[in-house]
From Swiss-Prot:
Its main location: cytoplasm. The gene is mnmG1. This is tRNA uridine 5-carboxymethylaminomethyl modification enzyme MnmG 1. Keywords: Cytoplasm, FAD, Flavoprotein, NAD, tRNA processing. Homodimer. Heterotetramer of two MnmE and two MnmG subunits. It is found in: Cytoplasm. Its cofactor is FAD. Belongs to the MnmG family. The keyword NAD applies. NAD-binding protein involved in the addition of a carboxymethylaminomethyl (cmnm) group at the wobble position (U34) of certain tRNAs, forming tRNA-cmnm(5)s(2)U34. NAD(+) binds at residues 280-294.
């Protein structure tokens, strides 16, 4: 058996799958090693994809050549368009996955992809050698391969670690704890020790998941039914479906009695007893944490979501907890519709090792070990979408590393992927990181619906998307700009414009003749309305949507573009790699420590390091002007 590979990906969750596919699609012989082949792309918690910021990540992965977007479009129970009454920066799609079909079909995709070998084993050791750095006479460590629990050595030029919650994973339910990376699945106990021995800093986080209920024991007559869209906005531009699934979800609420039971049983909560003493995701708190933090809140939303059309398991979104089994049962009896519900799987917390991402370059390669990339929860993130985005970038850059090409770096003005990676490297967070629109300074530019436009140059740089699709996207982009220019040059008389508005029951009126673009700026006027009125060209929906948005929000987009120009200037003020921050007088100790840890490549990057102030930046620039 040939055990030599270009790239080895460790872990086959959402990060590992995207990394392996990206590497293989770029022509590299790739091994994907996982503890369990049957749980590839497993949705360990909520069986859904998308949400604020997260949907943006998925569309970005998709246009660059990743898999998640088209996969959730195909294997979902429902898709829901959210925030449709809000501005374009807030509009998104959320998909409820058929988790078993999603998982099975992703494995099939991997098995049918050329250059990928699937291997079930546990990686226990990272193998390296010392080589002389070409830029100086120092020695650096370089990847040579991995060693598994079975004693097998696999050789590789590059390794991507995408280990999820399995590094020294420990499950907690009440006062019970045991080693596992996921309930019923063993943990990887030795790999993080190997990383420590290589000088990589390791810390601990935790996350948790709610109980799963037996659908047959739920009284749905007491619940509010919520259906998806028959014709949603899909995650992928290349998805063509006549009609989407509309399997419902259901809404209920906790009651006064629920809060009373939780307060009464709070002493059994692992976060109170000390059984869990690491940080969990702030934006997905357990129900006991919610009651602790918001003791006066009378009720909390609970969404009941099917996990698959071929399963009776119901995911209880909003009831995450690791309280003892008997307490979980007590809580259910206080919730409308769930009084007689039977638990199929109890909620639990899982603690695990991760490696703070300040140790990485923006390519996601480790700074100490050449050829070692990290992606997903091992970098301190939560969420399938965050994992997939990192996995894709790590897989692409692993391939670029082997070819001796420059890594693909996406900055925070170009994509939510850039925001995610930039924040991970520069901003310390006390809990697993989640992408949010509030973290993105340029939200209007980084819309869910325009990834194909803002990332077009990166699509070509990555090199996965085929020529026909690139030509299709290029034509679509040209159509957008051509039609915007056309609308700005079409003159419409005052009388004709006002008759048109009257026909749409719009009260607004013009006092003089206008350009067609001014008519489209009116809130309730769509491109389709204008198309009929002025006999305009017809385009695909995603093109028409861009024409509308770019005209209606033109002033705001221009303002944001000016801010991006200022950002880019700082990004191109490069800091020498060998700069000695100890020589710069006046910098705070906190800033000096952060700068030494991250070693920013530009002034722009330095501004985003935790603890670095504007005064510190001024001193660095002054030092560079004098000394360098």
């Amino acid at each position: 058996m040939n055990k030599d590979y270009d790239v080895i990906v460790v872990g086959a969750g959402h990060a590992g799958v995207e990394a392996a596919l990206a590497s293989a699609r770029l022509g590299n012989k790739t091994a994907l090693i996982t503890l369990y082949l049957d749980t590839i792309s497993m949705m360990s918690c909520n069986p859904s994809i998308g949400g604020p910021g997260k949907s943006n990540l998925v569309t970005e992965i998709d246009v660059l050549g990743g898999e998640m977007g088209r996969h959730i479009d195909e294997f979902n129970l429902q898709l829901k368009d959210l925030n449709t009454s809000k501005g374009p920066a807030a509009r998104i799609t959320r998909g409820q996955a058929d988790k078993y079909k999603y998982r099975r079909k992703m494995r099939e995709k991997l098995e049918k992809t050329e250059n990928i070998s699937l291997i079930q084993d546990c990686v226990e050791e990272i193998l390296v050698e010392d080589i002389k750095d070409t830029q100086n006479s120092n020695y650096i460590k370089k990847i040579t391969g991995i060693k598994t629990r079975l004693g097998i050595i696999y050789n590789a030029k590059v390794i991507v670690l995408a280990t999820g919650t399995f590094l020294k994973g420990k499950i907690v339910i009440g006062d019970v704890s045991y080693s596992a990376g996921r309930q019923g699945e063993t943990s990887a106990e030795k790999l993080s020790d190997s990383l420590r021995e290589l000088g990589i800093k390791i810390e601990r986080y935790q996350t948790a998941t709610p109980p799963r209920l037996d659908k047959k024991t739920i009284d749905f007559s007491q619940l509010e039914e919520l259906k998806g869209e028959e014709h949603p906005r899909y995650f992928s531009l290349f998805t063509k479906k006549e009609k989407n699934n509309t399997v419902p979800t259901w809404l209920t609420y906790t009651s006064d009695k629920t809060i009373e039971v939780i307060k009464e049983m709070m002493k059994f909560s692992p976060i109170v007893s000390g059984m869990v003493n690491t940080h969990g995701p702030r934006h997905c708190p357990s129900i006991d944490r919610k009651v602790l933090n918001f003791p006066d809140k009378e009720k909390h939303q609970i969404f009941l979501e099917m996990e698959s059309e071929n399963s009776d398991e119901i995911y209880v979104n909003g009831l995450t907890t690791a309280m003892p089994a008997f307490v979980q049962e007590k809580i259910l009896k206080t919730i409308k519709g769930l009084e007689n519900a039977k638990i199929m799987r109890y909620g639990y917390a899982v603690e695990y090792d991760y490696a703070p991402a300040s140790q990485l370059y923006p390519s996601l390669e480790n700074k100490k070990i050449s050829g070692l990339f990290f992606a997903g929860q091992i970098n301190g993130t939560s969420g399938y979408e965050e994992a997939a985005a990192q996995g894709f970038i790590a897989g692409v850059n692993a391939a670029k590393k082997i070819k001796g090409e420059k890594p693909v770096i996406i900055d925070r003005s170009e994509a939510y992927i850039g925001v995610l990676i930039d924040d991970l490297i520069h901003k310390k967070t006390p809990e697993p990181y989640r992408v949010l629109p509030s973290r993105a300074e340029y939200r209007l530019t980084l819309r869910y619906d325009n990834a194909f436009m803002r990332l077009f140059d990166k699509i070509k740089e990555v090199g996965i998307v085929d020529k026909d699709k690139i030509e299709f996207l290029e034509k679509s982009i040209n159509d957008v700009y051509m039609e915007i220019n056309n609308l700005k040059n079409i003159s419409v008389s005052m009388n004709e414009a006002n008759k048109f508005l009257e026909s749409l029951d719009i009260e607004e009126r013009f006092v003089k003749g206008v350009k067609a673009s001014e008519i489209l700026k009116i809130k309730d006027v769509s491109y389709d309305n204008l198309k009929v009125f002025l006999n305009l060209n017809d385009y695909e929906d995603f093109v028409k949507n861009q024409i509308e948005t770019m005209i209606k929000y033109e002033i705001f987009i221009e303002r944001e573009n000016k801010q991006i120009e200022k950002f880019k200037k700082l990004e191109h003020m490069y800091i020498p790699e060998n700069i000695n921050y100890d020589e710069i007088k006046g910098i705070s100790n906190i800033a000096r420590a952060g700068l030494d840890e991250v070693r920013p490549l530009s002034i722009g990057e330095a501004t985003r390091i935790s603890g670095v102030t504007s005064n510190d930046i001024t001193l660095i620039i002054a030092y560079m002007n004098i000394k360098l």
